[in-house]
Amino acid sequence: CNEGGHFAQMLALKDLFAKYDSVVLTDNERANYNIPALKNVKAIEYAMSFANKRKELTKNKDKKMTHASYLGSYFGLTKECYAACKKYRPKVIISTGSNIAVPLCFIAKWMGAKFVYIETRAKVYNKTISGKIVERFADKIIVQWPEMVEVYMGRAEYYGTLV
């Protein structure tokens, strides 16, 4: 999960964490402060290449992210995700979205794991870019607004909001 709202939504899954041994893969450097509240988290892995590139661009407003640098940092993110998945061999990967969701979806499919995508609560009437990409491959899509079930043409399930 990414930092901000995506991370907060992941933390809202605390009852699920209590039932299963889990590994958290995030680009949120502050995860160490919040993860101890979750039970059964065996490890925290960081996929920082994409987040670091974003921070670099935020600090230097004159610099723009070129397609090549974007793809390069995304390739780095994919390598980090693959390394974590290879190390822990998950049976199920749950993603609360954003940049990390796409590589995790394809890695899950390649490794034979189930992939559950939780669309962000911020989207009420249309899909995120990540949602558009992973929807054909995800084993389950969970949305946080009833209207989004129709947006995903019945392929998504609604259980309410996480936060």
Please place each PLM-identified region on the residue numbering.
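Well-ordered beta-strand positions
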Residues: 43, 92, 139-140
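Glycosyltransferases and closely related glycan-assembly transferases
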Residues: 82-92, 102-116, 132-133
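Conserved nucleotide-sugar phosphate-binding/catalytic loop shared by glycosyltransferases and other
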Residues: 1, 21-73, 147, 159
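Active-site-proximal region of nucleotide-activated glycan assembly enzymes
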Residues: 113-163
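An amphipathic, basic-hydrophobic alpha-helix
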Residues: 63-91
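Short His-centered aromatic/hydrophobic patch
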Residues: 96-100
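Short amphipathic alpha-helix
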Residues: 6-18
